[in-house]
């Protein structure tokens, strides 16, 4: 996990390609990964340690309103204010990510755990009214994506995933944005060319 001591960690900065998985990096499904659960998925890595890797899919919105599940968090939830499908593991469990307001410091704030930059894990048992002054918004995920130790590394060696750095704006982007393509477009050549890969392969 990144150290929160550097105030620059809480600013938006350009996100270059990453060379290793760590908390705060993203896994983009490569074009050959066609399994429906993860095709064109963007996974934000929340934890990566000796026990394995945990992340949430950023671009899989559900039709379930946050208000119907966790009404106390509906006000802080960003549009479209629906639950997102974080992955195939424990769909009955909820996990929340939030983006800090610029200049806010999460250190010592009950209910927040710093991940990277301005992104924090939010304890859903906390009082949202107490956290609202320092959060731009939150997104709540049903379930998560997980890998045992060494499993993700094997998938990366197989070229299933592209490991990239994240910007705070990636985490709360609206579903109408093609997040997978947007992230690739900001990468250097030749990686940015993958952004032109068609969504519907039958039209290629």
Curated annotation (Swiss-Prot):
Domain of life: Bacteria
Pfam families, per database record: DUF179
Family annotation (InterPro entries): AlgH-like
Cellular component aspect of the GO annotation: cytosol
PANTHER family: UNCHARACTERIZED PROTEIN YQGE, UPF0301 PROTEIN YQGE
Family that this chain belongs to: Belongs to the UPF0301 (AlgH) family.
Entry protein name: UPF0301 protein Mflv_0850
């Amino acid at each position: 996990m990144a150290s929160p001591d550097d105030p620059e960690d809480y600013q938006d900065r350009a996100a270059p390609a990453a060379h290793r998985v760590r908390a705060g990096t993203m896994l983009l499904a490569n074009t050959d990964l066609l399994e429906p659960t993860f095709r064109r998925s963007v996974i934000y890595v929340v934890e990566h340690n000796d026990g394995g890797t945990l992340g949430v899919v950023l671009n899989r919105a559900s039709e379930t309103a946050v208000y119907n599940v966790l009404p106390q968090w509906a006000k802080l939830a960003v549009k479209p204010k629906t639950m997102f499908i974080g992955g195939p593991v424990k769909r009955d469990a909820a996990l929340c990510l939030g983006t800090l307001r610029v200049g806010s410091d999460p250190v010592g704030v009950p209910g927040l755990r710093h991940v990277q930059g301005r992104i924090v894990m939010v304890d859903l048992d906390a009082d949202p009214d107490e956290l609202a002054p320092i959060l731009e918004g939150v997104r709540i995920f049903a379930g998560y994506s997980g890998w045992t130790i060494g499993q993700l590394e094997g998938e990366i060696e197989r070229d299933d995933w592209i490991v990239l750095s994240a910007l705070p704006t990636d985490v709360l982007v609206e579903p109408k944005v093609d997040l997978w393509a947007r992230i690739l477009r900001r990468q250097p050549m030749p990686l940015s060319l993958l952004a032109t890969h068609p969504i519907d392969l039958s039209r290629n």
